[in-house]
Amino acid sequence: MFEAVEGMLAEHADLEQRLGAPETHADARLAKQLNQRYAALSSIIGAYRELQQLDDDIEAARELAQEDPAFAEEAAALTGRRQEVEERLRRLLVPRDAADDKDAILEVKSGEGGEESALFAGDLLRMYTRYAEARGWKVEVLDAAESDLGGYKSVTVAVKAKGTPEPGEAPYALLKFEGGVHRVQRVPVTESQGRVHTSAAGVLVLPEAEQVDVQIDENDLRIDVFRSSGPGGQSVNTTDSAVRITHLPTGIVVSCQNEKSQLQNREQAMRILRSRLLAAAQEKADAEAGEARRSQVRTVDRSERIRTYNFPENRISDHRTGYKAYNLDQVLDGDLQPVLDSCVEADLAARLEALEQ
């Protein structure tokens, strides 16, 4: 497995040279791609060189231990350290999703449960926003349809990192595990009898595509315009500023009404459309290669849940990993990392197992 690192050394040196050239930075997108690859290789090569150094130190300690038994303890400590570094290197070498270095488009939609579901969708958006802010990410609302009580029938946001994140630390690499149906159990604000109700909201996470990632023929698009609407369906704009784009070959439909101008809404809708097309192309490629991942839920249904948020018990349960904690209030306030870590670990374990078969 570690033989592959030898080939990475030359690539790493070449990238270092290219990144030092002024002409590379004239193309911002190319510079970003090279920086991401360089960061990934730097982590791998750093661990590999540390492993080599530990091998030398262990050998030296064992030789010295033949004359002075005190060095036997040092050799044992170094051996333990070597096992840790070897495991870290194995993890770094596990193939990741091609889109793991990208920013994310995140959609939250209310499902069964009416107004209560819409309010819960708002709670989820707040959770993701707080989590993103804690990581220094930027959250931009692309489209939103509010409910009568201030929740969301649907809301779409872009989550963008600052600079070049470490491998596995980009928005999509972490937030992709949020895709699916989230179930909530609590007493709704509309419930007068104090009974606990169950409702659900659906989350879809896409890697944000850049224009060069997906080529879209304008002839394949049908673009409709209409007036933006607010809670209850009332019109909030006197002009046709909202935009609906249909990609005819795939049937994918995207609409945006959050911005004041038709041009801005069209640009935002195209961002979402590119990301959906990129995700669809990746899923098709995975399926053709026989490596299809569990697809994220696109229809909001209570029965296909990935996580339950139980307010009476202050409990959060992830049904994929078995993670359970009684700090729901903190999680909804953005303390989402332990939940995501359980998903990352489960995903990594599955990839390692597949790699070793």
Swiss-Prot record:
GO terms for cellular component: cytoplasm. It comes from the Bacteria. SUPFAM superfamilies: Release factor. The keyword Protein biosynthesis applies. Pfam families: PCRF (PF03462), RF-1 (PF00472). GO terms for molecular function: translation release factor activity, codon specific. It is found in: Cytoplasm. The modification N5-methylglutamine is found at residue 234. HAMAP family: Rel_fac_1. This is Peptide chain release factor 1. It comes from Nocardioides sp. (strain ATCC BAA-499 / JS614). The gene is prfA.
